[in-house]
Design a protein with these regions (language model features):
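N-terminal helicase ATP-binding lobe
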Residues: 37, 56, 66, 84-85, ...
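Short Cys/His-rich Zn2+-coordinating modules
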Residues: 31-48, 69-77
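Histidine-centered nuclease catalytic patch
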Residues: 62-86
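Acidic/polar hotspots within intrinsically disordered regions
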Residues: 2-4
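Polybasic, low-complexity binding patches
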Residues: 78-84, 97-121
Length: 121
């Protein structure tokens, strides 16, 4: 899967957009993490510059996102990006399946979960 932008720019970037669908994997044990945005869904909306609540990023799901899920993208071409944590909007049903891999909707937008790069909390 190709990622738009160059490695250095993306590594230090707050966001990542993909061409087509990518594999996302829910991270386990992240529910106690927080940031100053109020919620991880608000974190995603802030840095994605989204004014309304998005749909769940899981392909085939039409539910509204209820949470900002912590995910990795384990099958990206660039190994350096595979280990980075991202926030993806998800419904609670999909987010409640830790360590599960899902296909994202085409051309999804992910926001870094690295608070030092984003909200500074």
């Amino acid at each position: 899967m190709h990622v738009r932008g160059h490695f250095r720019e993306m590594f230090m970037s707050k966001t990542l957009s993909t061409k087509g669908s990518v594999t996302m994997k829910n991270l386990n044990g992240t529910s106690d993490k927080n940031c100053k945005c109020g919620s991880w869904l608000d974190h995603w909306k802030t840095f994605a510059k989204a004014s309304s609540t998005p749909k769940c990023h899981v392909a085939g799901c039409n539910s509204s996102a209820e949470v900002g899920a912590h995910v990795i993208l384990p099958k990206l071409d660039d190994e350096s990006f595979r280990k980075l944590n991202y926030i993806a909007p998800m419904c609670k049903s999909h987010n409640g399946q830790p360590d599960t891999e899902f296909k994202s909707k085409p051309d999804s937008f992910f926001v870094s979960a690295n608070k030092a790069l984003t909200c500074g909390a």
